[in-house]
Amino acid sequence: TRMTPTVRHEKAALGVLLIGAFGFLWWLSSQWYVGPSDGYVAVYQGGSSVMMTSYVPMMAAPSFYAGLILFAVGALIACFVFFGTLVVAKRDKTYQGSVPLVTFGAITAAIIAVFTIASGAIILIPTFLLSIGWISAVDPLVYRTIWWAFGHSSQQINVAAHISIWYLVAAVAFGAKPMSERVSRTAFLLYILFLQLASAHHILA
């Protein structure tokens, strides 16, 4: 059957919209690489020697905070792409039953990453606005408390990802299996739920 001009135009518009959306997502994802570059330049220029914690009121250049925010945007988009891939895999029935243990561990890392990025945004965006003079102050105690919700959990993304990779290497290289997948999955879940309790030692130090 022949399509009417209206239908053709609607399909063409949808195609352009999808291409634009994918292009925008790719651009956002590229900030994962652009952001650190901005931060490195700011540090090498000598005006952003605030070390890892970057506590206020020790201020860095605006490009330092902008680099962190851009990196976070790219990482967040990557997490959403990962979650979208899981939805497609479930729809296409690429696996039976629950997701594989390695994937479950990667999901754990991605969930922690989303929490980490959200915590960073809550405190780094106001700090960036402070650095460019749009707001007058950021409470140092509030900054420190929220910053470690971001700083502590950012380390644990790597831990969850590393454990997942260990499971993968053990299975591929040696054919090994965990003694109980249920226990392993429960451990990942508990890791998500109680991760932030351990961040208290940063605040109390």
Predicted regions and their residues:
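Membrane-embedded and interfacial regions of multi-pass energy-transducing membrane proteins
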Residues: 1-205
